[in-house]
């Protein structure tokens, strides 16, 4: 009987979405709110998505369920990202220890909050993430901690959402925080905060997006956007410089196609 092989020295943990962003590409993500199996990662891949955006903030997902979905996503080359409940969400560390390679922090309003987000994602001396062991990302192979920590730190993608007046006013300072990777505009909440709920594509919305893009470029970060599901506007946002884009949710995709099919059949039966 042979011993379990150790992970190779200098073990690497892939994050396909991060790798594409570093190569100057645009990545597309599917919002996930209701499907509770790893099959959603496979569907996301088949439909051309680079990452899944698991919404812990607005859903009933447990940490265990997210871990199972994330580990399937990792195995098939889709980046598993989770929107947690805030910059101080204590579940951030356990998610990262169990398959998740990107964290989306909602309602980031200041540089201090952005730094707290980084602290949750990064190991010392950069951050305050606790060092564990026996990581599923390495198939539980014995891995020297120095290699595991380096690989996990390199793979993580830290996303700060800009979705309040305060966050927008401080976006340049947020962008300047070291190890923040993406500034992601939450269009729904931002427009609500501006007193313009649902007015996607209005001048104030477009001006906010331009400001975030400019701040990201000035500090070597990635600009992203979600919430506005109009395809024509999404194309324009990408052309302007948005490179981390959520397309729509699995709920919306199922409703759209399911509704289309039943509508056509009802017409045929009329």
Q: Which ranges hold each PLM region?
A:
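Active-site mouth loops of central-metabolism enzymes
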Residues: 21-38, 80-85, 156-169, 222-228
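Alpha-helix-loop-beta-strand connector modules within alpha/beta enzyme cores
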Residues: 16, 63-97, 121-127, 150-153, ...
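N-terminal amphipathic alpha-helix/helix-capping segment at the start of soluble metabolic enzymes
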Residues: 1-31, 142-154, 210-218
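Short, well-ordered coil/turn segments that N-cap beta-strands
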Residues: 23-28, 49-50, 74-80, 100-101, ...
């Amino acid at each position: 009987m042979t011993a379990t092989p150790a992970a190779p020295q200098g073990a690497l943990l892939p994050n396909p979405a991060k790798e594409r962003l570093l190569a100057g590409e645009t990545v597309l993500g599917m919002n996930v709110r209701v499907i509770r199996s790893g099959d959603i990662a496979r569907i996301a891949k088949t439909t051309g998505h680079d990452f899944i955006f698991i919404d812990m903030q607005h859903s009933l997902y447990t940490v265990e369920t997210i871990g199972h979905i994330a580990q399937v996503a990792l195995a098939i080359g889709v980046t598993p990202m989770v929107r947690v409940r805030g910059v101080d969400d204590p579940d951030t560390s356990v998610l990262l220890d169990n398959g998740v390679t990107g964290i989306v922090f909602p309602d980031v309003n200041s540089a201090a909050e952005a730094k707290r987000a980084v602290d949750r994602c990064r190991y010392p001396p950069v951050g305050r993430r606790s060092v564990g062991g026996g990581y599923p990302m390495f198939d539980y192979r014995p891995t020297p901690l120095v290699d595991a920590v380096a690989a996990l730190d390199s793979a993580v993608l830290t996303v700060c959402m800009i979705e309040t007046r305060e966050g927008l006013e401080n976006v340049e300072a947020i962008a300047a925080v070291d190890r923040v990777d993406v500034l992601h505009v939450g269009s729904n909440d931002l427009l609500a905060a501006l007193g313009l709920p649902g007015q996607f594509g209005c001048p104030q919305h477009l001006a906010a997006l331009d400001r975030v893009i400019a701040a990201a470029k000035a500090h070597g970060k990635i600009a992203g956007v979600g919430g506005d599901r109009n395809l024509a506007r999404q194309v324009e946002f990408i052309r302007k410089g948005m490179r981390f884009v959520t397309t729509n949710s699995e709920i919306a995709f199922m409703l759209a196609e399911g509704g289309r099919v039943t509508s056509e059949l009802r017409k045929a039966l009329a």
